[in-house]
Structure formats: structure tokens, C-alpha cells
Amino acid sequence: MTRKYFGTDGVRGTVGEFPITPDFVLKLGWAAGKVLGARGGSKILIGKDTRISGYMFESALEAGISAAGVDVRLLGPLPTPGIAYLTRTLSAQAGIVISASHNPYTDNGIKFFGADGRKLNDEIELEIERLLDEQMSVVSTDQIGKVRRIDDARGRYIEFCKSTAPGLDLNGMKIVVDTANGAAYHIAPDVFEELGATVVPLANQPDGFNINRDCGSTHPEALQRKVVEEKADLGVALDGDADRLLMVDHAGNLVDGDQLLFVVARDRKENGAEMDGVVGTLMSNFGLELALQAEGIEFVRAKVGDRYVMEQLDKRGWNIGGESSGHLVCLDCTTTGDGTVSALQVLAALSRRKQGLAESVADVSMLPQKMINVRGPNRDGFMENGDVQAAMADVEDRLAGNGRILLRPSGTEPLVRVMIEGKDVDRVESLCRELAEVVEKAIN
């Protein structure tokens, strides 16, 4: 069955434009309540990030779910992985996240976790979609779901984060923490501080509009400057819903998801944890693959998206995977990507090696990689375009086996990502621009 509303990461779009409207979200809550309630669900959790529209959609979901006869527990602003954690520890049937992740405040989205703290399976999402086309009804008055807030959600999640790095002592470390004015603004700084670090908070004053604006993992420049200015040991950058992590070393150099994945995987292997292999994506730098190979760790590429990384991890029985963008998954700690937990795993690895971040990533050399996001409405079938095919063949000939090309439509935005990787940075950038120009003509 073709999906009508759910994309690769729930329902997402511009606030006020269908389907990100209060009336649709009301009905989505009702449909979810009907489907999950019929499966024996007693309650559904709702959490959100800090964008202004979150309050509106929280109310809509709350009304829809309770109209279907299912109880609701409101978590307030909380990182996406925190909602996943509480869904399973509070024995909820599902957790709903109101967030558009790293997108600006003008966007929002709705995604679901199942009772196990993992993304809701396709079968249930399709059941919910089917009900969205039916007439909404309300249960009898005595069966309407009850709603209450979970006042200690923040504290529960902070304690969980700390528990994933037992014995970690950050005394003597100075860490700049950029929470992107997002869901971790009142959580991540406290986690590191409670473990002994001196914390310099950055972008931790959300006003409903400034989420991800010139801050966080998508705009780490301010963090890079602040780390140098404060003479900090390192910096941590999260995104708006705190499931992504990038870091900055003491000199202000950005450390991406591929490099962090290497640090965590090597640490697991060196310290006797089960480490058969690592799952990356089609976008993962070839340098990561080479570095893991040198450590005797197998590397497999999944399609882009944490959903597909998780599928490969489950299929192979592995624990560690991630994306260049900073989605790191440590299934030996939690059930989904978690920026704060991932940062603690990196810090624990540095502590065990008695190294700084720059020294620890020196063993993974990233090949020059250029990516251009090409916007356009006509993404379907662009790979069959003759001009695009000819341009790709030409670029592959000129790379002469010393690089790779990837063209990939975004799952959440109207754009195509054009990526080229190779040994010579100037050549890579030139070829990427050439190919992007051809793609732009094809999709516009």
C-alpha cells in the first residue's frame, strides 16, 4: 500500500500548510488513538521540541487521542530520544514527537515511537493512514481519555543519560554545549555538569522562533568560535530535537558523525564489547570505511536515514551505526539516535584512551567530499534524464576510480543532494558544481 501522509520520518511540512494543520493533527491523534487503543494501549505520551507551533499541535493531538478513548501523558519539551526512552519505561503504547528536527521554526512534524521505544512499524502507520480517510467520531463521555502531565520527565531522562556512561568523570573538563535553542536546552548542559564538567551553555534560550537558527549541529560556526574563545577542551552541538551530534575539538575544528562513529566503534572493540561491524550510509565518507578496516571492523552501507541504519543493525545483530550528519545509534545503550548519549560515549572513549578529541580522530582521515543541495520540484525520475546520465558518466570517467558519486533525493525536502568524493579537493568541488548544474536544469 502506498503511503499517503507518512514519509521516512513521520509527517512533516510547513506549519499551516496541509498536512501540518491543527485539523489534520487532531484527526491524526484520533486515528492513532483508535489504532493503538484497539491493540490494548492504555496511554500515549506526547513530547515536543521548542518551536512555537508545538503547543498548538500538542493540544490537537491531546484532543484527538482522548476523543478516541485513550489516556494521554504530556512530557513537555523533551529530546526525541527522551520521548523514546520514556515510552518504554512508562509502559506506554506509543510516544508521539512533535518536531521538525533540524528544520527552521516554520516547519513542524509528527512522528511515532512504538511501545519498545523504536519507530512505529509500517503496518501500524498504514492502519493509521487508513483511518484518516474515515469520519471522526468520539467515544461516549465516560470513556474519554484522561490527560495529565509527567512533571519529572526531564529528571528521569537526565538520569538515564548519565547511566549510559557508568564511572565517567568529567571533572577538569571545560565543555561548550550548543543545544540549538531546542529540546535539550534544559537537559544536555545539566547532564555534563552533573558528571563534573565546567559547562559553557550556548543557544540555550529558546523563544519559539530561534530553534536551529544560526546554531546547533546544522550551523556550528558559533560553537567553533566559542570553544576557542573559552579555551575549552571541546564543544558539543545538538540539533533542535537533540538526536544529532557533532563535536568541536579544542582548536575549533569540526568533528562530524563519521569521525565520531569511528571513535565509538574503536573504543567498543578495544574494551571487549561485541563489535562485529558498523553500519554507515551511502553518504558516509570512504575514509571512515578505510579506518574501520584498519581496526578489523566490518563496515556496511545502508540507505540514508536512521530508519535504514536501524534496519541493517537489526538484520546483522550489530549495535553501532550512524550517519555523517551526526545521527549516531548505540543500541547497547538505547533504542534510537541520541545526541546527548552519543556525546557521553565519545567522552568515555576519550577518557579510556586518555586523549583529547583531536588526537582521537587523527586515525580517521576524511577524503575531500563536496555536497550541493539542489532545490527543485521535479525530483521523480530525474535519474532517467539523459543529460544527468551523461554528466554522471563523464564525472566518473574523470574521477578514474579515485572517488565516488552519489545523487539522492531528500526524504523530507524538495531537493536533490549531489555528492562527490575524491582525493583532490579542488577537483571534487569543480566536478560537483558541474554535476549540480545539470541536475538543477533537470528538476526545475
Swiss-Prot record:
Cofactor: Mg(2+)
PROSITE patterns xref list: PGM_PMM
GO molecular function: magnesium ion binding; phosphoglucosamine mutase activity; phosphomannomutase activity
UniProt binding sites for Mg(2+): S101, D239, D241, D243
GO cellular component, one term: cytosol
Keywords for this protein: Isomerase, Magnesium, Metal-binding, Phosphoprotein
One annotated GO biological process: UDP-N-acetylglucosamine biosynthetic process
Post-translational modifications: Activated by phosphorylation.
Catalytic activity: alpha-D-glucosamine 1-phosphate = D-glucosamine 6-phosphate
EC numbers, comma separated: 5.4.2.10
Active site: S101
Record family assignment: Belongs to the phosphohexose mutase family.
Role noted for this protein: Catalyzes the conversion of glucosamine-6-phosphate to glucosamine-1-phosphate.
Matches recorded under NCBIfam families: glmM (TIGR01455), PRK10887.1 (NF008139)
UniProt name for this protein: Phosphoglucosamine mutase
Gene name as annotated: glmM
